[in-house]
């Protein structure tokens, strides 16, 4: 049979740790005995993390290669449901593994001859993480509130139509986003007004 690390491909040929192997094993089992077999066969993950959100709850973040993100999102709803059953109700989120390139300064400009693409900037990566996080719901608006002590709070407006599906997870989303980017975020489902 396949080894437990068959579904995980780490950068620089590193070995997956125990938790990542567990996630990889769960994906393999799903591939073997579920109707997701055809879609899962081509897909792999790059990393997995378990973090604490909101006190005692734990969430699992699964990082996937950017080119495979679309394929994962096609089966994400069913995949998340199966994985959450396996890991006893821990929330599971899929996020693409993106790189942030440093801002070119006067000194560093000579090293990298190529211009830094927009998709590798900090802002673009953080926005993309947010979009991956709330999938299948859609972000319909964003407000950044700067408080008097110059701390920022990002208010993210999600699609009201998806409220029933994702409302119970918004605390997890906020915790995961804070852990990955260090930014505070609040999710809302506003009534639509013109």
UniProtKB/Swiss-Prot annotation:
User: GO MF annotations for this entry?
Assistant: structural constituent of ribosome
Q: Which residues form a coiled coil?
A: none
* Gene Ontology annotations of biological process type: chordate embryonic development; hemopoiesis; regulation of cell cycle; ribosomal small subunit biogenesis; rRNA processing; translation
Keywords in alphabetical order, please: Cytoplasm, Cytoskeleton, Nucleus, Ribonucleoprotein, Ribosomal protein
GO CC field:
90S preribosome; centrosome; cytosolic small ribosomal subunit; nucleus; small-subunit processome
Any Pfam family matching the protein: Ribosomal_S7e
Q: Which domain of life is it from?
A: Eukaryota
Localization, UniProt: Cytoplasm, Cytoskeleton, Microtubule organizing center, Centrosome; Cytoplasm; Nucleus
Just give the chief location class: cytoplasm
Q: Explain the purpose of this protein.
A: Component of the small ribosomal subunit. The ribosome is a large ribonucleoprotein complex responsible for the synthesis of proteins in the cell. Required for rRNA maturation.
Q: How does it assemble?
A: Component of the small ribosomal subunit.
PANTHER family on file:
40S RIBOSOMAL PROTEIN S7, SMALL RIBOSOMAL SUBUNIT PROTEIN ES7
Similarity comment text for this entry: Belongs to the eukaryotic ribosomal protein eS7 family.
State the protein's name: Small ribosomal subunit protein eS7
């Amino acid at each position: 049979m396949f080894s437990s690390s068959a579904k995980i491909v780490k950068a620089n040929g590193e070995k997956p740790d125990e938790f990542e192997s567990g996630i990889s094993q769960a994906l393999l089992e799903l591939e073997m005995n579920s109707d997701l077999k055809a879609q899962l066969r081509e897909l792999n993950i790059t990393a997995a993390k378990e973090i604490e959100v909101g006190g005692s709850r734990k969430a699992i973040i699964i990082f996937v290669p950017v080119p495979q993100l679309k394929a994962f999102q096609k089966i994400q709803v069913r995949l998340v449901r199966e994985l959450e059953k396996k890991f006893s109700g821990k929330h599971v989120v899929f996020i693409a593994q993106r790189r942030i390139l440093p801002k070119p300064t006067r000194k560093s400009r000579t090293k990298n001859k190529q211009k830094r693409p927009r998709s590798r900037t900090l802002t673009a990566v953080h926005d993309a993480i947010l979009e991956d996080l709330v999938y299948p719901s859609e972000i319909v608006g964003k407000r950044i509130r700067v408080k008097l002590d110059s701390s920022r709070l990002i208010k993210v407006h999600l699609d009201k139509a998806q409220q029933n599906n994702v409302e119970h997870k918004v605390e997890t989303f906020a915790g995961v986003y804070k852990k990955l980017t260090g930014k505070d975020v609040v999710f809302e489902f506003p009534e639509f007004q013109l």
